[in-house]
Amino acid sequence: MPSAVDKKFHEWTKSLDTHDSMVSIFEHIRDIPYSLSVPITDSKTSPEDVLIAGKGSCGPKHYLLAEMFRKLNLSVVFATIAFSWNDPDLRYPPGLRELAAKLPVAYHLACRMQVGCRWILVDATWDPPLAKAGFPVNDHWDGYSETKCAVKPLTLQVQPPINNPKKIESCFRIRDEEFCAPESEKNHWNEVDRARYYHEKVNVRTPGEIELIKQFNREFDAWLDNVRLDKIYLAPGDFSE
């Protein structure tokens, strides 16, 4: 029996060439509502989980994107990017802003895809309705250009593409399983390496930090629901429509 991933892959790419299939997959995954409530139990099951739940965070969404892109014989790796949830461009309500300021460093997941001699960032994190709250939604991706990063990396605003053919060999080191990336980004050939790296980073969090993260996740998801309903939360009891 075909898996949920196989069914959606066929639905999203039927009668399309490789380029149009790639863009279609990206747009469908981007449009899946972002949510922190769907746990990442296993990188291998995450693609199915996000389709079944109909929502998901950056991890499941990009595991799904990578799996589908690889079905098109595209070269894809994972990009883990360190960031802070306390992004000044996001129109947080005051209480959520206070929570975000207390959180430890977080780790975003996106993909890098090979286009000629370049490895471009492909980030399908935020669904379009979230743009009104300041989220950098990638509305119109052409399948060739670098997308906007969903978060602000801690050391650089944007990861520059690897676009110098003379540097490909030195920047793409198979032994190290990484590209020449800024301090805030770590690249991974596969899900296992990414999961190992991620757990190494988050396992140092204190019980207090974990409780703050859980509280933030609940309130963040509730706020996103209001944003999608065109209710931008400004202050207790005050919504802008």
What does each model-found stretch correspond to?
Residues 1-56:
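Secondary-structure boundary elements
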Residues 25, 29, 69, 76-78, ...:
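Generic structural hydrophobic/aromatic packing signal, biased to beta-strands
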Residues 40-102:
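Active-site neighborhood of thiol-dependent amide/isopeptide-bond enzymes
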